[in-house]
Amino acid sequence: MKRRGFPSHVGELFAPIVIGFFLGSSLVLTAEAQAPAETPAATSKPAVTSTPAISTPAAVGTPAPAERVTALKESVKRDQATLRQYEWMETTIFGLKGEEKSRTQSTCYYGANGELQKVAVGDKPESADKKHGVRGKVVENKTEDISSYMKNASAAIKKYVPPDASRIQAVQEAGKASITMLEPNKRARIDLHDYAVPGDVLGVEMDLVTNHILALQVTTPMEGSKEPVNFQVTFAALQDGTGYPAKTMLDAKEVGVTVSIENSGYRKHETE
């Protein structure tokens, strides 16, 4: 029995389609083969040292180069030495559930013994009339709890502001300092674990060009708080370049308490 094939004109009709199909497949495969493989982001080259730089925030936990930590310690020492020549105004504001509860001001300066001195300015805020009875007792207890929390918060902040060079050194020697590059060769954050108390983290954001501190981020356990508290410190600079903590902000959402501390009005301290 004789097989019947496709008419020649049918073959001529489908030939370009078949050839096109194979050519298309070949082009796709060739393109895929030639496409460059994805490569990780290139790390930035070190500026002046032989220590490798970290180029992305994904490098959290990488040991901090000794040069960076040394620069941080020197910056802290330099700023603190210069600030001992100044006096300034400190304004502390305590808030509860969005309402300002107290505002105090103090003139601050370093005494001859090297300790920070604070002299209250103005009258102490007047306390509200006490309520009597069971309700008054509840309010009184609540007020005492909040007052105690505020005192603990203030004490916690003092452990980190300003940073202490000797504690930075201790963290470095314990191998608990790490670095994250926020902006290659411009900004980095050095995280100091177990800086003041076990379980805390002091993050110091630095300008790598000037080696000045830009900000602090702190997470620390605190007496009277079930959860660790967090607060941020923004730094500014005097005309001579000396860095100082311009504003500290603690927001304890657990109890609705906020603490704001602002430093301003720096001037050379008058000595007798």
Cite the ranges covered by each PLM segment.
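N-terminal secretory signal peptides that target proteins for export/translocation
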Residues: 1-12
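Intrinsically disordered, low-complexity boundary segments flanking structured domains
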Residues: 72-80, 92-95, 164-167, 176-178, ...
